[in-house]
C-alpha cells in the first residue's frame, strides 16, 4: 500500500484547508505533485491511500475537481470527529437548515442573506459549485459564530466571536457534541478536550493544534507494515516531522515541488530527514541540483519526475482557422508597455491571430489596469486599430462608416482579458489554444504543466524543465525582439507545431502511467539492493 501525505495546508492556519467562497479566491491553483502521483497510481489500479493531517470539511469537492474520488482517504480529523468511513457526499440545501418562521432570503450575485423582521439572521457563503460552505450567524448585526459545513451533510465546526474577532473554534463530533475547543486569540492557540472524550486522547489539553495532529498522525504511521507499505510525503515544513514518527524500516519517499520546501545547506534537520528517506523525488533539475549540494550521497537517490495534469487532453485548436494565443499574466509583474505594444502589432499584422490575456484569480484592479493599458495603446497608435475583428469592418461600402457610438461602447477586438477562478476553466480555455506565451521572469508552473499536458508549444523568456527550445517551445534568448519570430514559428507553419505536439507526447509518456511506476519501483529496489 502506498500512503500519500499531501501538503494541502492553509496559509493563516496551517492545519486548516477550508474552502474559500468563490468571490474571495486569489491565485489558488491547486494542482501539485501529490495530485499528479495519486492520479497515476489510481489510473494504474495500484493500492493507494491519502493520509490527511489537515482539517478539510469540503475535501470531497476538492477531490472531485482533481479526479481523485476513487482513492481511499484516511483523515485525522474524520477520526477525531467520529465520521463514519462510508459516509457519502450530501449537498446541504437552504431548506435543509432550520430557520425561524417568517425568515426571508435575499440573493445577491455573491452570497445569500437570511432576514427576519428586517434584521439579518445569517450570511450563507457558497463555493464555486454553489455548495454551501459556511453560515455566519448574527445577533443585533454582530457575528455570533460561523458554522463550517462538511460536504457530507453536517455541521463540522463553529468559530465563536468575541469583540468582533474569532475567539475559539469548536470541532464537533458527528452527533453534534463538541470534541475539541481551539483558542484563536493572540495570546493562546491552546486546544482543550471535552471531558466526555478524554478517552480518545492522551492529554486533556494541548499547546496547539499541531500537537493534536502529531499525536493522531503518529498512531497511523506506526501501523505501516514493513515490506508492504510505502510512505510518500510531500516535502513541506509541516510534514517533515512525520518522517521521524514512522518506523525506520518502512520505505519512505520525500517529494519536492516548486518552492514549497525551502532548501538551505544550513538546514540540518532537513538534511537528516532526507537521509532517512529511501527516495527523493523532485519536479525540476534546479531542485535536484540544490539537494546534491547537501551531500553526494543524497544526489544518488534523487530523481526528477515531471508533473502532468491528466485532465488535459490534446486540444482541438487545429480545427479552427483562427490561432488562439494564451498569454499568461502575472499580476505582480504586468507586461511592459513595449511587450503589450508588440503583441498588438503582431495581432494587427496577422488577421487570424487572437490573444487571451489570462490572469489566475487576479485582483479586479490589476485586471482593469491591463485593460486600460491595452485601450490606451490602441487609441494612441493608428495601425493598432487593425486588432479589431474583421467582422466589424467587413462588408462596409466606400462611403459607409461604423457607428462611432457603437464602436466606443462595444469594440470587438481580437483579444480579451480573462480572469480565471479555477483549473477547470483554464483547461476548457486551453482546448482551443494554439500557443502559450508567458514572459514572466519565472514562468507560471501550472501553465507550463498544462501546456505540455495538452501538447501546446510555449514561448518563454527563460529556459525551464518543461520547454526545450525549438522542440516544444521557443526561448527568447535575445529578448522581446524575438517575440514575433517565436509566435510565427509555430502559428504560420504546421510542421513546427506538429513536431512540438509529438515531442510533448513523448515527454508525457516518459513520466506517466505504468512506465513511471516501473521507474519508481526500480529506484526503490536500487536503494534496497
Regions found by a protein language model. Give the residues of each.
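Membrane-proximal helix-turn-helix segments that form the acceptor-binding/catalytic region
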Residues: 218-226, 261-279
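A short, active-site helix/loop in glycosyltransferases that binds the activated sugar's phosphate group
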Residues: 272-300
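Conserved catalytic-core segment of nucleotide-activated headgroup transferases in glycan assembly
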Residues: 310-398
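Acidic donor-binding loop of glycosyltransferase active sites
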Residues: 426-443
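Conserved acidic donor-binding segment of nucleotide-sugar-dependent glycosyltransferases
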Residues: 473-481, 489-495
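A charged, aromatic-enriched C-terminal amphipathic alpha-helix characteristic of glycosyltransferases
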Residues: 495-528
Amino acid at each position: 500500500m502506498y500512503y500519500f501525505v499531501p501538503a494541502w495546508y492553509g496559509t493563516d492556519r496551517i492545519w486548516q484547508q477550508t474552502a474559500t467562497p468563490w468571490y474571495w479566491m486569489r491565485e489558488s491553483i491547486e494542482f501539485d505533485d501529490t495530485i499528479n502521483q495519486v492520479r497515476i497510481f489510481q489510473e494504474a489500479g495500484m493500492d493507494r491511500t491519502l493520509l490527511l493531517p489537515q482539517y478539510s470539511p469540503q475535501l470531497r469537492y476538492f477531490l472531485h475537481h482533481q479526479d481523485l474520488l476513487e482513492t481511499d482517504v484516511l483523515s485525522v480529523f474524520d477520526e477525531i470527529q467520529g465520521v463514519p468511513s462510508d459516509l457519502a457526499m450530501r449537498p446541504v440545501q437552504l431548506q435543509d437548515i432550520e430557520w425561524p418562521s417568517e425568515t426571508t432570503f435575499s440573493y445577491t450575485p455573491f452570497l445569500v442573506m437570511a432576514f427576519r423582521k428586517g434584521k439579518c439572521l445569517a450570511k450563507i457563503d457558497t463555493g464555486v459549485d454553489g455548495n454551501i460552505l459556511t453560515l455566519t450567524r448574527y445577533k443585533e448585526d454582530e457575528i455570533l459564530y460561523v458554522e463550517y459545513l462538511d460536504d457530507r451533510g453536517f455541521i463540522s465546526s463553529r468559530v465563536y466571536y468575541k469583540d468582533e474577532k474569532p475567539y475559539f473554534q469548536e470541532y464537533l463530533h458527528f452527533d453534534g457534541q463538541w470534541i475539541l475547543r481551539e483558542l484563536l486569540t493572540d495570546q493562546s492557540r491552546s486546544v482543550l478536550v471535552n471531558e466526555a472524550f478524554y478517552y480518545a486522547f492522551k492529554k486533556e489539553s494541548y499547546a496547539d493544534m499541531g500537537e493534536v495532529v502529531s499525536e493522531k498522525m503518529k498512531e497511523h504511521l506506526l501501523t505501516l507494515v514493513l515490506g508492504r507499505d510505502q510512505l510518500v510525503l510531500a516535502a513541506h515544513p509541516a510534514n517533515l516531522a512525520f518522517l521521524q514518527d514512522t518506523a525506520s524500516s518502512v520505505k519512505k519517499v520525500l517529494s519536492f515541488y516548486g518552492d514549497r520546501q525551502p532548501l538551505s545547506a544550513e538546514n540540518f534537520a532537513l538534511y537528516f530527514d532526507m537521509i532517512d528517506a529511501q527516495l527523493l523525488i523532485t519536479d525540476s533539475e534546479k531542485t535536484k541540483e540544490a539537494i546534491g549540494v547537501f551531500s553526494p550521497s543524497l544526489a544518488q537517490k534523487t530523481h526528477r519526475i515531471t508533473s502532468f495534469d491528466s485532465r488535459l487532453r490534446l486540444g482541438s485548436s487545429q480545427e479552427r482557422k483562427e490561432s488562439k494565443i494564451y498569454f499568461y499574466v502575472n499580476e505582480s509583474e504586468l507586461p511592459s508597455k513595449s511587450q503589450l505594444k508588440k503583441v498588438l502589432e503582431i495581432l494587427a499584422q496577422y488577421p487570424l491571430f487572437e490573444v487571451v490575456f489570462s490572469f489566475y484569480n487576479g485582483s479586479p484592479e490589476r485586471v482593469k489596469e491591463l485593460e486600460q493599458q491595452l485601450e490606451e495603446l490602441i487609441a494612441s497608435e493608428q495601425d493598432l486599430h487593425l486588432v479589431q475583428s474583421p467582422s466589424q469592418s467587413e462588408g462596409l461600402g466606400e462611403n459607409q462608416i461604423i457607428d462611432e457610438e457603437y464602436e466606443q461602447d462595444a469594440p470587438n477586438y481580437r483579444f480579451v482579458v480573462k480572469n480565471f477562478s479555477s483549473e477547470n476553466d483554464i483547461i476548457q480555455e486551453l482546448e482551443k489554444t494554439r500557443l502559450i506565451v508567458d514572459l514572466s521572469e519565472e514562468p507560471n508552473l501550472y501553465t507550463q504543466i498544462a501546456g505540455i499536458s495538452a501538447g501546446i508549444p510555449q514561448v518563454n523568456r527563460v529556459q525551464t524543465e518543461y520547454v526545450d527550445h525549438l522542440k516544444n517551445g521557443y526561448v527568447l534568448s535575445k529578448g522581446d525582439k524575438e517575440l514575433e519570430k517565436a509566435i510565427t514559428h509555430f502559428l504560420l507553419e504546421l510542421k513546427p507545431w506538429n513536431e512540438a505536439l509529438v515531442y510533448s507526447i513523448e515527454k508525457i509518456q516518459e513520466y506517466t502511467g505504468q512506465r513511471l511506476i516501473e521507474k519508481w519501483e526500480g529506484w526503490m529496489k536500487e536503494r534496497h539492493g
